[in-house]
A protein has these predicted regions:
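N-terminal helix-turn-helix DNA-binding core of bacterial DNA-binding proteins
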Residues: 22-61
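Canonical helix-turn-helix DNA-binding module
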Residues: 47-90, 96
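Residue cluster at the C-terminal edge of the helix-turn-helix DNA-binding motif
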Residues: 3, 74-79, 119, 138
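N-terminal leader segment of winged-helix/HTH proteins
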Residues: 1-30
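A cross-family signal for key residues in well-ordered alpha-helices
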Residues: 38-41, 56, 74, 79, ...
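Terminal interaction helix/tail motif
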Residues: 104-141
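Short helix-coil-helix linker/hinge
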Residues: 29-36, 95, 118-122
């Protein structure tokens, strides 16, 4: 097998990621992006959190978190609550509407996962995840 160029590798990864995201988000009943779903999921896990916590945990810039959270607030998926002791601090909490869209996303995500990744054996899937984590760890060093 001929060694692929860095451009071919990046293009291949990008095509897989983009196609996966489009197929997955197109199946949702509401128009919501994958980044918004990831942020919603993290807010749900934490119950309440500050924007800076989300940025650090998810590896997003502060401005990206601001843009995503503004969309989520407008869609009534999260609320922003000011800290009564320090007005500069705000906390996000997930709303009932946010829980509903996240539940739908999780159900569709599981179906998508079972469909797309069914072409891989359990061993191949474990290797794929291991390789992705290894590369991500190395890139972040």
């Amino acid at each position: 097998m001929e060694k692929p160029s860095i451009y071919e590798l990046i293009n291949m990864v990008e095509q897989v990621n983009n196609a996966s995201i489009v197929q997955y988000t197109d199946s949702l009943s509401k128009s919501i992006g994958i980044s918004s779903i990831i942020v919603l999921s993290e807010i749900k896990k934490r119950k309440t959190c500050q924007p800076i916590e989300l940025a650090k945990k998810l590896g997003y810039s502060k401005s990206s978190i601001t843009a995503i959270s503004n969309k989520l607030i407008r869609a009534s998926y999260i609320t922003s609550i000011a800290d009564p002791h320090d007005r500069r601090k705000t906390y996000f909490t997930i709303t009932t509407e946010g829980m509903d869209i996240l539940k739908e996303a999780e159900i569709l995500g599981q179906k998508y996962y079972e469909t797309i990744y069914s072409v891989l054996t359990e061993e191949e899937l474990a290797q794929y995840v291991h390789i992705q984590r290894k590369l991500l760890y190395y890139i972040k060093q």
